[in-house]
Amino acid sequence: EIFHSLNSQGKPLTQSDLLRSFVFMRAEKGSEDRDKLYERYWKYFEEDFWDRLVRRGNQWSSHLDVITRVFLSSKKGFPVDSKKVHLEYKNWIIQDKPYNNVNDELSAFNQYGRRYRYFQS
């Protein structure tokens, strides 16, 4: 339970932290190369841009938290509550099985993130 609430610095985990953990745990279970997936798709989201805070309504969120919510909302076809992104994403992946593997999932997320960043420039 603590693992799902605090990071290594003792700060609360964000929705994108929880999502990343969920994705890479599934990659390992599926015998996919986590390091290769990280280098190919997730390392891009470690750049400073993704940690910058942006205001959405009366709430401040990192670009990474925003894109995880927008990505999921676009895939599900309706807005997802910013506090429930991890749970909704997990349910979507388990129930709908929209991707054959984590590689395909991260590829789609990475492409979506690159388009988002392009339009933020």
Show where each model-derived region lies.
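Polyanionic (Asp/Glu-rich) segments that form extended negatively charged tracts
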Residues: 1-121
